[in-house]
């Protein structure tokens, strides 16, 4: 671990193509953290299978996600980049924490309730219920100080803290108590068609989201079709959520403040503004897209990054899990 550096853990599921919401909300912020913190950036493939995945698609998206991390500026020399399933300690720790969790507290999780409604016709898997316990294990085995999360994940961080404190008080001091880290930069990117909802790749309307790998002509089309209003003024206000969302996208791409954007487009209407938002987004994404495509031609390199990352991650995680096993009364295998 980096000397005297605080530890950060975060991850993204390879359960679908990444949107610009994933990029601006998570990955771009992670890049800013890598010099100041000891960062563990994971591809959380175990979380992905709480909902059925096609095996070949899961493998393809996992490699693409690793390539996207690196192409976006996450340096494998400075950070630990690894695949969750390559470190069995995640599942070992989850089982021990699972046995200290209560069904009531897990079933009260907002995300579980929301996803249960979605899958009630096909049957709700136990993985959906236990998902937050695996997330707690992910964080605690690296003795993470901070966890970059969106506001929709703060409930899971609270559960992680509760489980850490429960284990510490039942046995003895084992885990650091992590805190959620909500970055000050960036913005929550909303749906282009329903701007009061978060942008999601699972939307039925493909015009509502932009993928990191969308080509320029698709980005231009989706921004041109983005919902605005009949006010006709580029203003950053909750009364104009569609315009506000496009302003956030432009601000994330260019670094311009929303006040500067308002001033620049005063009296211009939406057509020129939308064209410029699309151009700024294309300029931001094109170098990443090119680098991703280049990296995907060298799968051996990507797998080597993951192998080295898993070795480093396992060294730290196994130390924590050994402590957990000893404290609950397991006989540790002879080395």
UniProtKB/Swiss-Prot annotation:
Coiled-coil regions, chain positions: none
Keywords: Aminoacyl-tRNA synthetase, ATP-binding, Cytoplasm, Ligase, Nucleotide-binding, Protein biosynthesis
InterPro entries: aa-tRNA-synth_I_CS, aa-tRNA-synth_Ic, Rossmann-like_a/b/a_fold, Trp-tRNA-ligase, Trp-tRNA-ligase_bac-type, Trp-tRNA_synthetase
GO cellular component, one term: cytosol
Pfam families: tRNA-synt_1b
Motif ('HIGH' region): 14-22
SUPFAM superfamilies, alphabetized: Nucleotidylyl transferase
PROSITE patterns from the UniProt entry: AA_TRNA_LIGASE_I
Molecular functions per Gene Ontology: ATP binding; tryptophan-tRNA ligase activity
Record localization: Cytoplasm
Enzyme Commission number(s): 6.1.1.2
Residues annotated for L-tryptophan binding in this entry: 138
Binding site for ATP: 13-15, 21-22, 150-152, 189, 198-202
One annotated GO biological process: tryptophanyl-tRNA aminoacylation
Role summary: Catalyzes the attachment of tryptophan to tRNA(Trp).
Subunit structure: Homodimer.
Full protein name: Tryptophan--tRNA ligase
High-level lineage: Bacteria, Bacillati, Bacillota, Clostridia, Eubacteriales
Gene name in the database record: trpS
């Amino acid at each position: 671990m980096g000397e005297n550096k605080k530890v950060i853990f975060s991850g993204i599921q390879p359960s679908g193509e990444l949107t610009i919401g994933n990029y601006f909300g998570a990955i771009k912020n992670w890049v800013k953290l890598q010099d100041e913190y000891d960062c563990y950036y994971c591809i959380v493939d175990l979380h992905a299978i709480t909902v059925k995945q096609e095996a070949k698609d899961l493998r393809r998206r996992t490699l693409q996600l690793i390539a996207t991390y690196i192409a976006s500026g996450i340096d494998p020399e400075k950070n630990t980049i690894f695949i969750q399933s390559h470190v069995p300690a995640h599942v070992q720790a989850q089982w021990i924490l699972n046995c200290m969790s209560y069904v009531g507290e897990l079933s009260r999780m907002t995300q579980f309730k929301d996803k249960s409604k979605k899958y009630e016709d096909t049957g709700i898997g136990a993985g959906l219920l236990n998902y937050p316990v695996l997330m707690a294990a992910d964080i605690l085995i690296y003795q993470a100080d901070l966890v970059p999360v969106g506001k929709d994940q703060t409930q899971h961080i609270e559960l992680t803290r509760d489980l850490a404190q429960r284990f510490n008080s039942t046995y003895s001091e084992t885990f650091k108590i992590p805190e959620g880290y909500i970055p000050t930069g960036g913005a929550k990117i909303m749906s282009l068609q329903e701007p009061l909802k978060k942008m999601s790749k699972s939307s039925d309307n493909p015009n509502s989201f932009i993928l990191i790998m969308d080509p320029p002509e698709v980005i231009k089309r989706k921004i041109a079709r983005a919902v605005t209003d009949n006010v006709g003024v580029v203003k950053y206000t909750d009364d104009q959520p569609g315009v506000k969302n496009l302003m956030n996208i432009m601000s994330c791409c260019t670094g311009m403040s929303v006040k500067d954007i308002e001033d620049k487009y005063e009296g211009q209407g939406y057509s020129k503004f939308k064209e410029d938002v699309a151009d700024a987004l294309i300029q931001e994404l094109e170098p990443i897209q090119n680098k991703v495509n280049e990296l995907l031609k060298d799968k051996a390199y990507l797998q080597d990054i993951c192998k080295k990352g898993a070795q480093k991650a396992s060294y730290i995680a196994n130390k924590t899990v050994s402590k957990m096993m000893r404290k609950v009364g397991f006989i540790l295998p002879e080395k």
